[in-house]
Regions:
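Fold-independent oxyanion-binding glycine-rich loops
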Residues: 2-5, 30-33, 39, 54-56, ...
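Conserved active-site segment immediately N-terminal to the catalytic lysine
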Residues: 44-56
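Short, well-ordered, mixed-charge alpha-helical segments that flank or form enzyme active sites
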Residues: 6-11, 36-40, 45, 59-62, ...
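Active-site C-terminal subdomain of aminotransferase-like
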Residues: 56-142
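Active-site phosphate-binding strand-loop segment of PLP-dependent enzymes
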Residues: 1-33, 50
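Conserved PLP-binding catalytic core of the aspartate aminotransferase-like
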Residues: 150-172
Length: 172
């Protein structure tokens, strides 16, 4: 599932979903592209088995980097799965990573930009970083409402704000 649905700006209650999925044998995999870097997603506490993110959106960089984090339960599935791999194989990538390498060309400028972003977040402190994102989201929502606009989502995310156009809007 998604932590935040981009087109609607909706925040999903991943913590509650994680509790439900944890009572089954299913893996709980979360698309965190719009969430990671924008608000807390504690994998262990929320019973998340796999968290996938990218450098765009929540991490505040251009597209080009992917991040994957797995629980031990998820890694066990990855390492024992018998399904064929056609392009990307996490087992091969893990082996390369253990040797300090990657299977594909590393976009060095994006890695350096990531270092800059992470250093800045570390300087500020994670709680303060998330607080600042919440402050900006609250301000954006406040200003939209002050302009007579309404939010699209009843459960808005702090990472993206979707605003409904007025019914009489003409254009685009």
């Amino acid at each position: 599932t998604q932590a935040c649905e981009t087109s609607t700006g909706t925040y999903h209650d991943i913590e509650s979903l994680g509790k439900i999925v944890a009572e089954t044998e299913a893996l709980f995999i979360v698309d965190g592209i719009t969430a990671v870097g924008a608000f807390p997603i504690p994998m262990d506490a929320w019973k998340i088995d796999g968290l996938v993110a990218g450098s765009q959106k929540g991490v505040m960089l251009p597209t080009g980097l992917s991040f994957v984090s797995f629980s031990e339960k998820a890694w066990a599935h990855v390492l024992t799965a018998k399904t064929p791999r056609y392009y990307f194989d996490l087992r091969r990538e893990l082996k390369a990573n253990q040797n300090g390498e990657t299977l594909f060309s590393t976009p060095v400028p994006l890695v350096k930009a990531l270092e800059f972003i992470l250093t800045d977040i570390q300087r500020l402190g994670l709680p303060q970083h998330f607080k600042e994102i919440r402050r900006r989201a609250d301000f954006t929502r406040y200003m939209a409402k002050a302009l007579g606009l309404s939010l699209f989502s009843k459960s808005p995310s702090d990472s993206i704000t979707a605003i409904s156009l007025p019914k009489d809007f003409k254009g685009v």
